[in-house]
Amino acid sequence: MKDLRTLAAYALALLLLATFVSHSWSAPKGSFQRRNWTPQAMLYLKGTQGRRFVSEDRNEGDLYDTIRLESRSQNTENLSISKAAAFLLNILQQARDEDEPY
């Protein structure tokens, strides 16, 4: 009885392995080839954030970190993390107080 279970387990494992191998051989190879992107497609893929690279000179840092992205907000006041956290906590407490029945 135990030998039958062991034999069935080996047969199942062999069947799964054969299925995996046959599916991997039949996978389309063309989709994994490198594409020749047009300049317009590269601009689309690059998006609004620009090219990002890691400089070999550690003093320069990432180009992404040195570029200031434009924002639509007219608010020029920089908000510190502690002020932002206090503001968020205040909003959450107000929402909780409004939901509580009296």
UniProtKB/Swiss-Prot annotation:
Write down any Gene Ontology CC term: extracellular space
Please list which residues make up the signal peptide: 1-26
* Prosegment residue ranges: 27-35, 50-102
Write down which residues bear the modification named Glutamine amide.
Answer: 49
Which residues are tagged with the site Cleavage? 35-36
- GO BP, one example? positive regulation of systemic arterial blood pressure
Molecular function in Gene Ontology:
neuropeptide hormone activity; type 2 galanin receptor binding; type 3 galanin receptor binding
Its induction, per UniProt? Up-regulated during folliculogenesis.
Q: Which UniProt keyword terms apply here? A: Amidation, Cleavage on pair of basic residues, Cytoplasmic vesicle, Hormone, Secreted, Signal
The record's tissue-specificity note reads: Mainly expressed in the brain and ovary. Detected bilaterally in the adult brainstem. Expressed in neurons in the dorsal habenula (dHb). In the dHb some neurons project into the interpeduncular nucleus (IPN) where expression often overlaps with galr2a and galr2b. Weakly expressed in the liver, intestine, kidney, heart and gill.
Please, which domain of life does this record's source organism belong to? Eukaryota
Q: Which Pfam families match?
A: Spexin
Does Protease count among this protein's keywords? no
Keyword Secreted included in the entry's annotation: yes
* Cystines in this chain: none
Q: Which family does it belong to?
A: Belongs to the spexin family.
- Record PANTHER family: SPEXIN
**Chain's role:** Plays a role in the regulation of food intake and energy metabolism. May also be involved in suppressing the anxiety response by promoting the expression of serotonin-related genes such as fev, tph2 and slc6a4a.
Q: What is this protein called?
A: Spexin prohormone 1
